[in-house]
Design a protein with these regions (language model features):
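Histidine-dependent nucleotide/RNA phosphoesterase domain, centered on the 2H-phosphoesterase fold
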Residues: 2-308
Length: 308
């Protein structure tokens, strides 16, 4: 897979200490972008194409098993079996440096139908090696406010930003806007890596205010509180994790890896004809989730939910 030389690219931001930097705005202000929606879309496309090509090559050329089972998820599922009350499981992790504070958007109903179809196709092939993310846990991470801390630290950061400010941030992208003003995500594509599968999107370039503009504005509002923000790896990407690998037996043989790539490429070929779009926060407002979020969480567990 090659990328046109004309496409705008922007480097991802690696995880680091708390900072006053607004990486989202830096992308918009870059001379190659200048806030133009088409360039925003190109940045997301370029990142996705490079990542996908690298992963396909990894699976296709692998002399050994390319899949790494998610040990954290395996341990989490084992804890759930011993202690079915998820709240108690998360409470046991509250004092560890594994918790995050993130603003999420939920997929709309039509995208959930698409996701269900994709999950089934991959699960039918791979079997028990793949853990399917439950529907109620599916989400899109819009921006992160604090990364990998005890819950007490996250709550201190939230207090400094201010609950009223966060509420305004959530409302700014929520159902109080008319449909044509809300950012849209288009052109879904199934992405893969050694840990799992995800459905990625790119911002619609037919509107002046894109999904990335929303991310930049929300981050600006958080910084306006005086807080410094530490984030996980951040990239021009909009994706929903659909499943994670908890085994790799299927991928031990060349045929398994070949068949997996064939199914993924067939899914993506079918997706190219899809005209549906995701209007962010059209059906449900944005939400702030705080705690152990690595494997998703139900909307009812949100600390703050966007309203009008």
């Amino acid at each position: 897979m090659t990328i046109s030389a004309q496409k705008f690219e922007f480097p991802a931001l690696t995880a680091g200490p708390p900072s006053r930097r607004n990486w989202y705005k830096e992308l918009l202000d870059d001379p190659g972008c200048q806030g133009r929606p088409i360039k925003v879309r190109e940045a997301y496309e370029s990142h996705r194409e490079l990542f996908y090509a690298k992963q396909v090559q990894l699976f296709a050329a692998a002399e050994s098993n390319p899949v790494t089972p998610d040990q954290a998820l395996i341990r989490y599922l084992e804890k759930q079996q011993r202690q079915p009350n998820i709240a108690q499981v998360e409470h046991g992790l509250a004092s560890q440096d594994v918790n995050c504070s993130v603003i999420w958007a939920r997929p709309p109903r039509d995208m959930l139908d698409l996701i269900k179809s994709i999950q089934k196709k991959v699960l039918d092939l791979v079997g028990a090696d793949l853990y399917i993310m439950p529907f109620e846990n599916l989400h899109l991470s819009v921006i992160e406010l604090s990364h990998r801390h005890p819950v007490s630290h996250l709550r201190a950061v939230l207090e400094k930003i201010g609950i009223d400010r966060v509420q305004r941030m959530l409302d700014a992208g929520g159902p109080c806007l008319i449909s044509k003003d809300r950012p849209r995500l288009v052109f879904p594509q199934l992405n893969i890596d050694k840990m799992g599968i995800a459905l990625s999107f790119v911002p619609c370039s037919d509107q002046d205010y894109t999904y990335h503009h929303l991310r930049a504005d929300m981050h600006t509002q958080a910084l306006a509180s005086g807080v410094s923000v530490d984030m996980c790896y951040t990239a021009p990407s909009a994706h929903v994790t659909l499943g994670r690998f908890i085994g790799n037996e299927y991928f031990k043989k060349d045929k398994g890896r070949t068949d997996f790539l064939r199914v993924v490429e067939k899914i993506n070929s079918d997706l190219k004809g899809l005209q549906d779009e995701w209007i962010v926060a059209e059906e449900e407002g944005l939400e702030l989730q705080l705690g152990y979020l690595k494997f998703g969480r139900q909307r009812e567990e949100a600390d703050i939910i966007g309203t009008c």
